[in-house]
Amino acid sequence: MKRIINTVLVLLLTSMCFAQENPVKIVFDVTSQNTKVHESTIRHVKAMSNAYPDSKFEVVMYSGAMDMVLKDKSAVAEDVEMLAKKDNIDFVICQGTMKRHEVDSTQLIKGVRSVPDGILEIIEKQKEGWGYIKESQ
């Protein structure tokens, strides 16, 4: 966790120097069911989107992170809905994960979209030059 926080801090400090000149594209990989991980993901997305206002961010959730985007279970529902309204932030959930958890799109927080495969979504973003951050404990 300390390593993640230190990495984010370095990125934020660097971003202050280059925010206006060099927009970034970052994909966040979230698989944990731990609500502390969900909360730290939201903090990181908020901080980085403020530091890089002209940049793009996508949070990809799969496996154990299903509850992060469920209306009735998420500890960060209000934040997810608020951030998803921004043009430069996307929250996506894996359809395979939804199927395994027997969840349909009506149960998702407003603004969350689904993709066929979370891992492939991350791979595609990386192929397009997006930076990668793994959110974990």
Feature names for model-found ranges:
Residues M1-K2, C17:
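Helix-enriched interaction subdomains in cytosolic or periplasmic regions
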